[in-house]
């Protein structure tokens, strides 16, 4: 059967050449190769039946083996050469992917850092924005909520495009777009707060392209523990970029004496990163790391993809758990620096800011803690998952559940400690964020396990939409709204500014506990859904010999 396949693939009269070569070999007393196949030019020599690898010459059209004198050289196609080497011979990876995978992952991670740096630069100068535009907590929370709303609406669109068109071009265009909008927003006059809100919405559209598509490229470059490691690096960019956003916003504001300059740093870096993605990130094939040498069949329709994802219980529960994480991180990231500033005003260790520029110490400290806990959390989560995989195949969702439930305890303690000790509050923030950030990369790895390659961009997009819709799209505004609502029924004082925001933020740990429950539900269905995905991948793969060129 192998001879028939190879003969049909060879060009011009391969069957006749095969018959002539066989007759000549029999006259010389030669035996067929050790692979048991007498085709494809894989001829035994002197009865040994082995041809060394250095006797094969690669050409643009295929490969040709050098044959000792007296034996004719028979050209072979790449598929035939692979068959001659035997079933145990590894398939060579494309050179473009083999050399540039690490660099591509690093550039994509850098782009993710910039996305979150830009997103949380606004939070780093939030008090200045409130004083400059004259808005209360509700208006300040609207900036983040509008950003997330546009982000989640655009995410499914980019997920559809990412499964069907050139992904790195979409990434670069998204970065160029949000960089231009962010830079322009730094020139908005004081009386046009609505323009700043609109600009944040447009930035959300640009950043949606990146967060939706970039993880799927990494998923197509690596597999198994290596993919977990690379996704850990990529998702470490979330807390790192968030922390750098606070630090950049407050530091640039202090250096320039004007908070507007904080919005002019990330656009320059974004333009550079977008260019690097266009030049250095390889155009990987979807499912390259999973298809084991075959080629994926034609992809399914968008409607069929959506139906399959909705029926995937591990995907649904992990998406709901991710929504709880987004709710907490969105609310805490937006309001904790301001909450700690108000705590110090109550403790009379700081003064109320009535005009910008305001103090930046809390944003700097919180940013530094976020950067370090992000690194520690991602590394701890990935390491704990690898260790637990040796003991249970449900390690991924179980580690996430433990991290979420432990984080909820320390988030509660933040509001208890802040009343008397800012240092104690920072310690609780450190532990709580470390546990909360431990599930970023693991959640992405769960998605890669239970979703087939041709649906991953759509799956990431739908998960982003769901997590933002139920999470940080409304949590910053909701916390600000509750805070203002409580203050309306009390006297206007620094104490009630502090207490009202703290009471509103107490909603976060309860949502985090709910997320931990969703991860436990994911663990119930993880193994069966992963097995289904592996079976579907095998059905989608066409063996190389059957692929028409």
From Swiss-Prot:
The keyword Oxidoreductase appears for this protein: no
Keyword annotations of the record: Cell membrane, Deafness, Endosome, Lipid transport, Membrane, Non-syndromic deafness, Transmembrane, Transmembrane helix, Transport
Broad class of the protein's primary localization: membrane
Membrane topology: Multi-pass membrane protein
Subcellular localization: Cell membrane; Endosome membrane
Tissue-specific expression: Expression is high in the lungs and liver, low in the lymph nodes, spleen and bone marrow, and very low but detectable in the thymus. Not expressed in red blood cells. Also expressed in the inner ear: expressed in the cochlea, both in the lateral wall and organ of Corti.
GO terms under cellular component: endosome membrane; plasma membrane
Top-level lineage group: Eukaryota
Disruption phenotype: Deficient mice are viable, do not exhibit cardiac defects or embryonic lethality, and are generally normal and fertile. Deficient mice have decreased levels of sphingosine 1-phosphate (S1P) and dihydro-S1P in blood, accompanied by increases in very long chain ceramide species, and have defective lymphocyte trafficking. S1P levels are increased in lymph from deficient mice as well as in specific tissues, including lymph nodes, and interstitial fluid. Moreover, these mice have aberrant lymphatic sinus that appeared collapsed, with reduced numbers of lymphocytes.
Cysteine disulfide partners in this protein: none
Keyword field contains Cell membrane: yes
Molecular-function GO terms, alphabetical: sphingolipid transporter activity; transmembrane transporter activity
PANTHER family membership: SPHINGOSINE-1-PHOSPHATE TRANSPORTER SPNS2, SPINSTER
Protein name: Sphingosine-1-phosphate transporter SPNS2
Organism: Mus musculus
């Amino acid at each position: 059967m192998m001879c028939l396949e190879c003969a049909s693939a060879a060009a011009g009269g391969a069957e006749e050449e095969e018959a002539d070569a066989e007759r000549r070999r029999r006259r010389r007393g030669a035996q067929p190769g050790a692979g048991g196949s007498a085709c494809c030019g894989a001829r035994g020599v002197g009865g040994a039946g082995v041809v060394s690898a250095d006797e094969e010459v690669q050409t643009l059209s295929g490969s040709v083996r050098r044959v000792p004198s007296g034996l004719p050289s028979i050209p072979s196609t790449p598929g035939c050469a692979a068959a001659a080497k035997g079933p145990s011979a590894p398939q060579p990876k494309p050179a473009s992917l083999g050399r540039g995978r690490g660099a591509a992952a690093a550039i994509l991670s850098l782009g993710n850092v910039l996305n979150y740096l830009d997103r949380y630069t606004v939070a780093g100068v939030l008090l200045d924005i409130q004083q400059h535009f004259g808005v209360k907590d509700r208006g300040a929370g609207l900036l983040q909520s509008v950003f997330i709303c546009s982000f989640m609406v655009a995410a499914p669109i980019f997920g559809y495009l990412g499964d069907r068109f050139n992904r790195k071009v979409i990434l670069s265009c998204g970065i160029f777009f949000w960089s231009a909008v962010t830079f322009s927003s730094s020139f908005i006059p004081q009386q046009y707060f609505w323009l700043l809100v609109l600009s944040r919405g447009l930035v959300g559209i640009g950043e949606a392209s990146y967060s939706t598509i970039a993880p799927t490229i990494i998923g197509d470059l690596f597999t198994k523990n290596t993919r977990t490691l690379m996704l850990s690096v990529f998702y470490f960019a979330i807390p790192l970029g968030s922390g750098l956003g606070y630090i950049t916003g407050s530091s640039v504001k202090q250096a320039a004496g004007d908070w507007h300059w904080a919005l002019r740093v990330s656009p320059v870096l974004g333009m550079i990163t977008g260019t690097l993605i266009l030049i250095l990130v390889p155009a990987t094939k979807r499912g390259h790391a999973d298809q084991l040498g075959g080629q994926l069949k034609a992809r399914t329709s968008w409607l069929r993809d959506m139906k399959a994802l909705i029926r995937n219980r591990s995907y649904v529960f992990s998406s709901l758990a991710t929504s709880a994480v987004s709710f907490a991180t969105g609310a805490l990231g937006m309001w904790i620096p301001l909450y700690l500033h108000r705590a110090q005003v109550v403790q009379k260790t700081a003064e109320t800011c009535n005009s910008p520029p305001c103090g930046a110490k809390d944003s700097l400290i919180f940013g530094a803690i976020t950067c370090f806990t992000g690194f520690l959390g991602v590394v701890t989560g990935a390491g704990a998952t690898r260790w637990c995989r040796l003991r249970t195949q449900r390690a991924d969702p179980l580690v996430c559940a433990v991290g979420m439930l432990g984080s909820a305890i320390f988030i509660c303690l933040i509001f208890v400690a802040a009343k008397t000790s800012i240092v104690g509050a920072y310690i609780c923030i450190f532990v709580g964020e470390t546990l909360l950030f431990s599930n970023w990369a693991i959640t992405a790895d769960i998605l890669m396990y239970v979703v087939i390659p041709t649906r991953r961009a759509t799956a990431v997009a739908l998960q982003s939409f769901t997590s933002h819709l139920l999470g940080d799209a409304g949590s910053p505004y909701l916390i600000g709204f509750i805070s203002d609502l409580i203050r309306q029924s009390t006297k206007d004082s620094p104490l009630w500014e502090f207490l009202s925001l703290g009471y509103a933020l107490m909603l976060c740990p309860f949502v985090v506990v709910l997320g931990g429950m969703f991860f436990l539900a994911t663990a119930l269905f993880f193994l069966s859904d992963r097995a289904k995905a592996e079976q579907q991948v095998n059905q989608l793969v066409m063996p190389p010999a059957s692929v028409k060129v």
